[in-house]
Amino acid sequence: GLFDIIKKIAESI
C-alpha cells in the first residue's frame, strides 16, 4: 500500500 512505500523510503535513509 501507500504506507509500504513510505516505510521503504524510511529504511532507505
From Swiss-Prot:
Source organism superkingdom: Eukaryota
InterPro entries the UniProt entry points to: Aurein_antimicrobial_peptide
UniProt note on tissues of expression: Expressed by the skin dorsal glands.
Location(s), subcellular: Secreted
Secreted in keyword set: yes
Gene Ontology cellular component terms for the protein in this record: extracellular region
Intrachain disulfide bonds: none
BP terms from Gene Ontology: defense response to bacterium; innate immune response
Major subcellular location class: secreted
Membrane spanning residue stretches: none
Modified residues (Isoleucine amide): 13
UniProt keywords, alphabetically: Amidation, Amphibian defense peptide, Antibiotic, Antimicrobial, Immunity, Innate immunity, Secreted
Purpose: Antimicrobial peptide with activity against B.cereus, L.lactis, L.innocua and S.uberis. Probably acts by disturbing membrane functions with its amphipathic structure. Inhibits the formation of NO by neuronal nitric oxide synthase (nNOS) at micromolar concentrations. Acts by a non-competitive mechanism, probably by binding to calcium/calmodulin and as a consequence blocking calmodulin attachment to nNOS.
Family: Belongs to the frog skin active peptide (FSAP) family. Aurein subfamily.
Protein name (database record): Aurein-1.1
Organism encoding this protein: Ranoidea raniformis
